Design a protein with these regions (language model features):
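An acidic/histidine-cluster motif and surrounding catalytic segment
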Residues: 1-124, 135-176
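Conserved ATP-binding N-box helix of the HATPase_c
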Residues: 132
């Protein structure tokens, strides 16, 4: 199993996170998560860190909600991944393109402060949430949201995000 992870960052949020410094970590985390969730295929995912303006435009265009949000996931496949037909198993040379995850780094900063953890932890939490959406998870009601949040906790327990140092997460202007 392998993962091709394409990382992008809107230049307006480049002062919030040094994406180049943690790109290898992101690659490893998605590899661990997908190995746990989906063992027998190769995958491709795009992850974009952006600002509230860009995510608000996407949210308005695709979800008809004209406001910023924390994370959007654009699944490339209609089927739930656990039920993929055998022909879509993803060979060594042909990864299955799961889709795009877009995270508002601005909203992640606010939520991290509200929840009492680091900006980086919030980004990883949101990435795990987005990945679950790409794999067919949804939360139309409270019980399904609870199941999804439990799965996010499991995914985060599989990686050691505590290894971050202050040089991989850039301080906010108010923290300088």
């Amino acid at each position: 199993m392998s993962i091709d992870l394409h990382l992008e960052q809107n230049p307006t949020v480049s002062d919030l996170t040094d994406l180049d410094a943690i790109a290898q970590d992101w690659q490893q985390w998605f590899q661990v998560w997908l190995t746990h969730l989906q063992k027998d295929a190769n995958y491709e995912i795009a992850l974009r860190l952006t600002d509230d303006d860009e995510i608000q435009k996407l949210n308005a265009q695709y979800r008809h909600q004209d406001r910023p949000t924390d994370v959007l996931a654009f699944a490339a496949l209609e089927a739930d991944i656990p039920e993929l037909p055998p022909g879509l198993a993803g060979s060594e040379n042909e990864p299955i393109y799961l889709g795009d995850i877009v995270i508002s780094s601005n909203t992640a900063v606010v939520q991290a402060q509200e929840r009492g953890h680091s900006h980086q932890y919030e980004l990883v939490w949101l990435a795990a949430h987005g990945l679950l959406h790409l794999l067919g998870w949804d939360h139309p009601d409270e019980p399904s949201l609870e199941r999804m949040l439990e799965q996010q906790d499991i995914l985060l327990s599989l990686i050691d995000i505590r290894e971050f140092t202050s040089d991989t997460v850039k301080p906010q202007a108010s923290e300088k």
